[in-house]
Amino acid sequence: MSSSSGVPESWIASFCSLLGHEYFAEVSEEFIEDDFNLTGLQTQVAMYKEALEMILDVEPEDDDDEEEEDEEDEEDMSGGDGINKPHGERRHHSRIASDLSVIESSAEMLYGLIHQRFICSRAGIQQMSEKYELGHFGICPRTNCNQTRTLPVGLSDTPGEDTVKLFCPSCLDVYVPPNSRFQTVDGAFFGRTFGALFLMTFPEYDLTKTGAESVSNLTRSGSDDTTVINGMYARNIAPGLGRGKIYQPKIYGFKVSEIARSGPRMQWLRSKPDDLSVLDEARRYAEQQGSDDEDESMGVSSRTASRRRGPPRRQKQNGSPMAIEQNGAESEL
């Protein structure tokens, strides 16, 4: 495949431009050529070497094909068996076609597994952040999230278990992509680590912005609410949850009873404490460790003081080696 400028398009660019592959980032060839980044993938992908060569646009070696063509020419010149020749050619070409289809599927699988690792690297997550700012991953379908941008994630790191899902950082829920063309994308190509790592890498993103607004930087916007809890800004912790953000089903203005068969269920999943400081596990851990250290130091000091009590009896007797006790009375020689 070639681009409009006449320069042949790489396999990676062609793969990412396919319909339904809009979530993918273009993995750099430097990342793929580093053997450390491919550790453990040889056993997961069939025809690993050929698939890797296809991804890197490396031309396969044609030595075997040339030898077979030379042998066929020699058979023609020597008047070999011409009856079996067409059948052999058909079998040879069918084998080549089947190998290409297997290599193509293996290349897609291998690229997906490499992509899972690449988007967790510095260069890969920066690429995904640019796509996130442009809204390439879509928005949350929940009304109270106000069109918060979503992130592609997988529910498993093992290929073939589930398709890609969209994680909303506003309501902390996972949704199926709205378009059916994404239902063929394996969720393992994005993995379970990317979503949390993205939010920890870019904590300054203002998640309260809607999909139509640009993602601003909390540190540059001069926001007063810059309280940090567990490494994240407090206003970015599930802004779509809590009081006033829980849907209440009503019929003609009357709330549907919770004990009704069609009543609301599991609304506690949308709840959030009013005081977010109770979620600050890092602060509580530091305080607990500090109190434990104080108790331990006090225990050590008390044990040291107890050891210092009861000096030797010789010191009470002015250290005289000639002082002895006889029947409870002291005498000197």
From Swiss-Prot:
Keyword set includes Phosphoprotein: yes
InterPro entries with a match to the protein in the record: Casein_kin_II_reg-sub_N (IPR016149), Casein_kinase_II_beta-like (IPR035991), Casein_kinase_II_reg-sub (IPR000704)
Glycoprotein in keyword set: no
Post-translational modification as stated in the protein's UniProt record: Phosphorylated by alpha subunit.
Acidic residues bias (residue ranges): 58-78
This protein's UniProt keywords: Phosphoprotein
Subunit structure, interactors included: Tetramer composed of two alpha chains, one beta chain and one beta' chain.
Family assignment from sequence similarity: Belongs to the casein kinase 2 subunit beta family.
Protein name per its UniProtKB record: Casein kinase II subunit beta-1
Species, as recorded: Neurospora crassa (strain ATCC 24698 / 74-OR23-1A / CBS 708.71 / DSM 1257 / FGSC 987)
Name of encoding gene: ckb-1
